[in-house]
Amino acid sequence: MILLLFLFSLALGAPSESPSDGSKVKLQLDDHRVKLLRGSCPMFWYSFNGRCYKYVATHMSWADAELYCVSQRANLVSIYNEEEEEFVKSLIKNFDHAQRYTWIGLSDIHKEGRWMWSDGCAVNFTHWNVGEPNNGLGGKTEQCVHSIGDSKKWNDQKCSLNLPSVCATRINCP
């Protein structure tokens, strides 16, 4: 049973492509060459500015994605600046070339209009798409946030939607 759970957890975040040496993946993002490095991160996790990040291809609701990240001693990714936003986009593009919608750790599930990262940190950086957040054009049904592939910006969405996600290890809030 433990072996089955271990294999399942590996499959949740298994990359669609893996490098030959297992330590780094090179990818092209716009005109910038970006390397995803494992550093001291576990298998299937990639290092950036002292944190480890994992793309999870399995489609889950926002809450289930957060629970999965917590089971990995992490949270859905919190993004604190443009450089980190670019890294997360690179990570998503590496594993999903179409860059489909992907959950990040931002939500206002605790209080409407009060956006907060799932790791408890305050929001000091945003990358909203034009007209967002809009709560579903007037409703109060969109409380969780995903990245939008083509515009590479953020959108609020119903938390029950099943999407891939990005986990990141915890840090002290900036």
Predicted features, each with a name:
Residues 1-174:
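Extracellular, disulfide-bonded carbohydrate-recognition/adhesion ectodomains
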